[in-house]
């Protein structure tokens, strides 16, 4: 069975899918034909050889290749992809790069040299030097007669105040250009003539800019101790000089903007950084004060020593009172014991003597045996002084023990006082060491803060320069696109003006009554009045013979 019929759109879509998926990256070589550059910037063309023809389109061509306009007969190499234009059922090449014949060999040589020098380390990012912040002398290596040096001088006069510029004249195109530029770089470095160098040249083809792809120039830039800014060609032009230099600028004017900032902007930037630094410092100091507030009473040495001295005095007074109290208490106990012992003995002796008196008075009438007995008893009673002596001997060890106890207690309290004094002295030393440590930490934080602010300042300056460079590039590109679009619209409007046709000898015919344009003989009538407009005025005519007009028409 045969397949069902397909819609034209469905078949075209299948063909489009097959072509665009299988021919997404192609390179075509041929001759341009039917070249048409539209005011929108799109390029429509045909590319052919002796046996075939292929339509093509290059969208936004003018924004990428504004320095050269292609024409019929140019031999080119086109990079792009196949696409199908469904409304016409045609396939075409949609280009994204166009290389003129002869430039392909140079591009191949460019890529080979770039790969080799990259492997040798000539384009390494870590070897690039930073630009000076406010250069006093700016060296410019360029042609002294071109518009480039005028652009640089104009920007510097507007953006900077105190500076010197040293122009080293060289040729920027031709066989000797690379050697002259290399020699200029060597002389500038040997004599230390500038703080920063600008290598500048206007736009051109790859052949015109080839001097800046020479290996001798790349090596001279790499060996330079002075920072170099490359400003060669337009923004879309890249040379090996751009990769080897420390900074690439899209245009010579942008290079002047990069190497020299205006004094007013520098003051504003510094004031902003100063305000930020002061605000950050105040916040940091406030935070540190809050953290150190609990340690304030320890850092006040006078208050600390006063409190410690009061504590020592209180301890000493307490010790003295305690010792005196113990001594007084011991003396009272000793006196009480002595009074008790003495009072009891006297009362007993008094009673006994009275009893003896009674016994002696009765002994006169008793017998000698009783007297002897009584005498024996009297002898016994006379042994009490010996007991007193024994009691005194027994009290002597107690007195010695009491004295020893008091001395030992005093010794212990003195040692305790000495230990407390030692601990307080140790605590004072520890607090003093902590104070020194905190002071050192504060000094370290201050140094870190200073280094951090300097680093932040440098980063902010670099970011500001990058943003400014990008903004200037975007504005310049938009301005150029707007000028090109305005010129194209102006030309288109001028070409559509009907009055321009009248200048070439033509006339416009209008109906006299209705004032409408008459474009056919059929609208004419005999003896009718018509109005004719010429280049420099109008006239009223009467139709006399229509056949003649028809004969002319035929």
From Swiss-Prot:
One GO CC term, this protein: cytoplasm
Any GO molecular function: nucleic acid binding
Assigned protein family: Belongs to the XseA family.
Sorted UniProt keywords: Cytoplasm, Exonuclease, Hydrolase, Nuclease
Function of the protein: Bidirectionally degrades single-stranded DNA into large acid-insoluble oligonucleotides, which are then degraded further into small acid-soluble oligonucleotides.
Enzyme class: hydrolase
Catalysed reactions, semicolon-separated: Exonucleolytic cleavage in either 5'- to 3'- or 3'- to 5'-direction to yield nucleoside 5'-phosphates
Cellular localisation: Cytoplasm
E.C. no: 3.1.11.6
Identification of the protein by name: Exodeoxyribonuclease 7 large subunit
Principal cellular location given in the protein's record: cytoplasm
BP GO terms, sorted: DNA catabolic process
Subunit structure and binding partners: Heterooligomer composed of large and small subunits.
CDD domains xrefs: ExoVII_LU_OBF
């Amino acid at each position: 069975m045969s397949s069902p019929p397909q819609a034209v759109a469905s078949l075209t879509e299948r063909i489009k899918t097959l072509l665009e998926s299988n021919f997404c990256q192609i390179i075509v070589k041929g001759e341009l034909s039917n070249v048409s550059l539209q005011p929108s910037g799109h390029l429509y063309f045909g590319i052919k050889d002796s046996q075939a023809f292929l339509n093509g389109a290059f969208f936004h061509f003018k924004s990428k290749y504004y320095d050269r306009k292609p024409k019929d007969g140019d031999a080119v190499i086109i990079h792009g992809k196949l696409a199908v234009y469904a409304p016409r059922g045609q396939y075409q090449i949609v280009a994204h790069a166009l290389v003129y014949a002869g430039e392909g060999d140079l591009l191949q040589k460019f890529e080979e040299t770039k790969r080799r020098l990259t492997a040798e380390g000539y384009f390494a990012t870590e070897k690039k030097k930073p630009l000076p912040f406010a250069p006093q002398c700016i060296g410019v290596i360029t042609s002294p007669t071109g518009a480039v040096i005028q652009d640089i001088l104009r920007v510097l006069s507007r953006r900077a105040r105190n500076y010197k510029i040293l122009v080293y004249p060289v040729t920027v195109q031709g066989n000797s250009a690379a050697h002259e530029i290399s020699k200029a770089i060597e002389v500038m470095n040997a004599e230390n003539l500038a703080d920063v160098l600008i290598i500048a040249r206007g736009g051109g083809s790859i052949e015109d800019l080839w001097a800046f792809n020479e290996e001798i120039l790349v090596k001279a830039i790499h060996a330079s101790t002075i920072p170099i800014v490359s400003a060669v060609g337009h923004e879309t032009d890249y040379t090996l000089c751009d990769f080897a230099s420390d900074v690439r600028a899209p245009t010579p004017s942008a290079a002047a903007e990069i190497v020299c900032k205006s004094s007013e902007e520098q003051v504003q930037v510094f004031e902003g950084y100063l305000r930020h630094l002061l605000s950050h410092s105040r916040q940091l100091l406030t935070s540190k004060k809050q953290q150190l507030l609990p340690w304030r009473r320890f850092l006040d040495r006078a208050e600390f020593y006063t409190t410690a001295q009061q504590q020592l005095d209180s301890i000493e007074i307490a010790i003295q009172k305690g010792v005196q109290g113990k001594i007084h208490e011991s003396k009272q106990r000793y006196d009480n014991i002595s009074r008790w012992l003495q009072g009891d003995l006297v009362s007993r002796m008094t009673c006994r003597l009275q009893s003896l008196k009674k016994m002696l008075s009765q002994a006169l009438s008793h017998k000698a045996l009783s007297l002897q007995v009584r005498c024996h008893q009297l002898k016994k009673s006379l042994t009490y002084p010996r007991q007193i002596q024994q009691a005194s001997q027994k009290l002597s060890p107690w007195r010695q023990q009491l004295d020893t106890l008091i001395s030992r207690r005093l010794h212990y309290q003195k040692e305790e006082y000495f230990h407390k004094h030692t601990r307080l002295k140790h605590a004072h030393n520890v607090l003093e060491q902590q104070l020194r440590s905190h002071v050192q930490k504060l000094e370290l934080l201050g140094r870190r803060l200073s280094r951090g602010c300097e680093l932040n300042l440098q980063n902010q300056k670099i970011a500001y320069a990058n943003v400014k460079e990008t903004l200037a590039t975007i504005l310049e590109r938009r301005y150029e696109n707007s000028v090109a679009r305005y010129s194209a619209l102006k030309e288109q409007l001028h070409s559509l003006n009907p009055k321009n046709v009248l200048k070439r000898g033509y006339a416009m015919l209008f109906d006299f009554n209705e004032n409408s344009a008459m474009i056919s003989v059929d609208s004419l009538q005999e003896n009718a009045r018509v109005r004719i407009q010429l280049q420099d005025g109008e006239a009223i005519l009467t139709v006399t013979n229509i056949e003649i007009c028809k004969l002319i028409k035929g």
